[in-house]
Regions:
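An anion-binding catalytic pocket shared by soluble metabolic enzymes
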Residues: 4-134
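Conserved mixed alpha/beta catalytic, RNA-binding, or beta-rich assembly cores of soluble enzyme
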Residues: 137-138
Length: 139
């Protein structure tokens, strides 16, 4: 298993968060990112059988069942992501029944995904219907 900190998708997310903060686009905890990852991107870095915990989604996301997302945490600041990604980000997989996020990595302080994740996931569902290469929602 490769070290998660060496994953290109994680480093891209850390750089994006740092740049958005540096440019003043997301002050304090004013923005969020959800990055849809291909299973092949994550398989070298995760034990797919090791679910750290389940976090209820509060809606039916079955359409995204089995999909992986790297997501900013609730109440987290973009400026802190690069220094401590494992606290400020989480890598989740949508459960088979679409009711939960299976935490695979991150949110090590007991945190959870942004409260806006349902809106992000609904946006991903809609965009994927018209663009199969779609992979990010950010604001």
């Amino acid at each position: 298993m490769k070290d998660m900190m060496s994953a290109p998708f994680l480093n891209q997310m850390m750089d994006t968060c740092a740049n958005m903060y540096r440019l003043g686009w997301d002050e304090r905890n004013g923005g969020n990112i959800s990055l849809l990852l291909d299973e092949k991107e994550v398989e070298e870095y995760l034990d797919k059988q090791n679910v750290l915990r389940l976090i209820p989604l509060g809606f039916d996301a079955k359409e995204l069942s089995g999909k992986y997302f790297l997501v900013t945490g609730t109440g987290k600041y973009f400026k802190n992501v690069k220094a401590d990604p494992e606290t400020n980000l989480g890598l989740i997989r949508i459960s088979e029944d679409g009711q939960n996020a299976e935490l695979m990595w991150g949110y090590k302080d007991g945190g959870r995904f942004t409260s806006e994740l349902p809106a992000h996931l609904k946006s991903h569902m809609t965009r994927l219907k018209v663009d199969k290469t779609h992979n990010v929602v950010m604001h």
